[in-house]
Amino acid sequence: MPHLAELVAKAKAAVEDAQDVAALDLVRVEYLGKKGHLTLQMTSLRELPAEERPAAGAVINQAKQEVQEALNARKEKLESVVLNARLAAETIDVSLPGRRMENGGLHPVTRTIDRIETFFGELGFSVESGPEIEDDYHNFDALNIPAHHPARADHDTFWFDTTRLLRTQTSGVQIRTMKAQQPPIRIIVPGRVYRNDYDQTHTPMFHQMEGLIVDKDISFTNLKGTLHDFLRNFFEEDLQIRFRPSYFPFTEPSAEVDVMGKNGKWLEVLGCGMVHPNVLRNVGIDPEVYSGFAFGMGMERLTMLRYGVTDLRAFFENDLRFLKQFK
């Protein structure tokens, strides 16, 4: 192998002449590839006596290693040149102002809850909360809801077993509050509730706000005046409002409240009524001495009406394009 040293010298010279990584790779293939000059030297070993082959093979491998080291060194140098050139072209002016972080915003339903809490807080209402996993007594029995009522059915309610369920309303908190304290009582109860329903205007989980007053000489007139003031404050306009007779097991008389929409049609916004005497008796309050009114409304429903949202499900999809409109 008299010309092995010459091949190594030519390879090193070619390595130094390569001006970029692509050209350098061509040199590697030419000398160290499967059919490269140095690789083919291994085929000449068969012409040597067996006892000379190990030494000759070691010489060839040493030559290949020298060329590989030269390739590695040249590649590192070329990549360094490219990196330095790119860094020079991407010089950052550190005197420029930093990139400002975008401020977040409250979810529209949270805005609605906060707005309602503020209004009723100014009227002396306190905010109460309670468990979302409820028992049938607080969710149904104490509220004068009979055993055969459709709300108890499996297709409407998420039951864990025969006595425990995901609450279908926040009214259970009213029961707990009336049992824990004597009148006068003035509370609102915001929270998540669960019903087995899902379409454009219903979701299995939604937010509800209920209100309750219990005191002496509370009348339906007090209820109407409170809700008139609330709705006009919430929608920020002098709305046309009507009360329709309705039925709820826990209030008597009961009503549903509508507001006149911009399209000239009535829109239902909440339900209300005077607390049923049986409910007061169930919590140990004498209905001959005290009376009260209660109301309940869906937060998503009010938010849809306030902001003109047509699909309830948009509130739960976390689409920033939608949510940024409410910042």
Curated annotation (Swiss-Prot):
**A Gene Ontology biological process annotation?**
phenylalanyl-tRNA aminoacylation
Give the binding site residues for Mg(2+). 252
What Enzyme Commission number(s) does the record list for this chain?
A: 6.1.1.20
Q: Where in the cell is it found?
A: Cytoplasm
EC class name: ligase
Cofactor mode of binding and number, as noted: Binds 2 magnesium ions per tetramer.
Its required cofactor(s), as named, are:
Mg(2+)
* Description of how the protein assembles with itself and partners: Tetramer of two alpha and two beta subunits.
* Gene3D superfamilies listed in its UniProt record: Bira Bifunctional Protein, Domain 2 (3.30.930.10)
Alphabetized GO MF terms:
ATP binding; magnesium ion binding; phenylalanine-tRNA ligase activity; tRNA binding
This protein's source sits in the domain of life called Bacteria
Looking up Pfam families in the UniProt record yields: Phe_tRNA-synt_N, tRNA-synt_2d
Its recorded reaction(s) are: tRNA(Phe) + L-phenylalanine + ATP = L-phenylalanyl-tRNA(Phe) + AMP + diphosphate + H(+)
- Source organism: Yersinia enterocolitica serotype O:8 / biotype 1B (strain NCTC 13174 / 8081)
Q: What family is this protein classified in?
A: Belongs to the class-II aminoacyl-tRNA synthetase family. Phe-tRNA synthetase alpha subunit type 1 subfamily.
Q: What is this protein called?
A: Phenylalanine--tRNA ligase alpha subunit
Answer whether the UniProt record assigns the keyword rRNA-binding to this protein. no
Keywords linked to the UniProt accession: Aminoacyl-tRNA synthetase, ATP-binding, Cytoplasm, Ligase, Magnesium, Metal-binding, Nucleotide-binding, Protein biosynthesis
GO annotations of cellular component type: cytoplasm
Where this protein primarily resides, as one coarse class?
cytoplasm
